[in-house]
Amino acid sequence: MQLYETPDNRAPKGTEVYAARTRNNMRIRAMTAPSLTAESKGTVVILNGRADFIERYFETMGDLQSRGYHVAGFDWRGQGGSQRLLKDPMRGHIRSYREYDEDLRAVMDGVVTKNCPGPYYAIGHSTGGHILLRALSRQTWFKKAIVTAPLVELQYGPWPKSVAFFLAAMTTAFGFGWCYLPGFKRPPFLFRGFDNNPLTSDAKRWARDVRTLENNKNLGVGGPTYAWLVATILSFKDLHKRRKGQGLNSPVMIILAGRERVVDNAASHRFASAMPGVSVVTIGQSLHEIMLENDTVRKEFLAVFDSYVG
């Protein structure tokens, strides 16, 4: 397995690439890179979002290295440089979020704890934030965690959640869970143009990621499948059930995007208010991908990181 650089998006200095193996022998692309300061403050593990790939976070990893942290990142199964799940590798597919839990375990046990110094911190974005919250109710890897624009609940548009779940569950039960959800297509979202972009207002960083994907189309993932939606809603239920029954094993800072159009910010506030040790801050001018936003937004994000993690 390898990483893919472009002239304006170089891998972090000292990067090492790994193929982590899950218990069911899935290959998960992972990487680590050392701190750029004389003394290390620990390691930050980045958990990226649905359809993401490690290369999109090179810049943020460099920011963290310069602050004295080792960094680690990986791609979830079915996306980026990790092993795909279907014959059509472009489908954003998962059967259960327990599979994502296993990806994280494989990376932590097989890569991070063997190659990077503690204490360990985590930044989870969107779907990665959701999986991180799942992990924090079960595991004790991380001293502190930050989740950006977490997928605590979807915006369902005109469909009530119960109707969306019923239709997706029935479609999956009849053997069509591999099909794309209505309105979603095979090409990766990065190829759909920048106009009315719901993810970032930064055209330069968007174009940088488009170039990476144009040169390495194997990293791309298209729309999600019916099975993905079923698994996601079931994981929402599991997460909220745990919220009522127990706290998390690490303190968490939720960073929300003030101009969010993808996930449900109100659900994140409800989650935080019911869960001890969870704080919330909003970056008002940010769209969904906070770490890939314009310089002003990224400066605010890094200021929150510096204040919270140090």
Please give the residue ranges for each predicted region.
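An N-terminal hydrophobic leader/cap segment in hydrolases
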Residues: M1-R21, M26-L36
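Active-site glycine-rich loops that stabilize anionic/oxyanionic intermediates
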Residues: L47-D52
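Conserved alpha/beta-hydrolase
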Residues: I54, M61-K87
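Alpha/beta-hydrolase active-site loop
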Residues: G92-V112
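Alpha/beta-hydrolase-fold enzymes
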Residues: T127, L132-G220
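Short beta-strand/loop motif that positions the catalytic acidic residue
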Residues: L248, I254-L256, E260
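Short alpha-helix in the alpha/beta-hydrolase fold that links the catalytic acid
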Residues: S250, D264-S273
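Catalytic active-site module of serine/aspartate enzymes centered on a nucleophile-bearing elbow/loop
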Residues: V278-G310
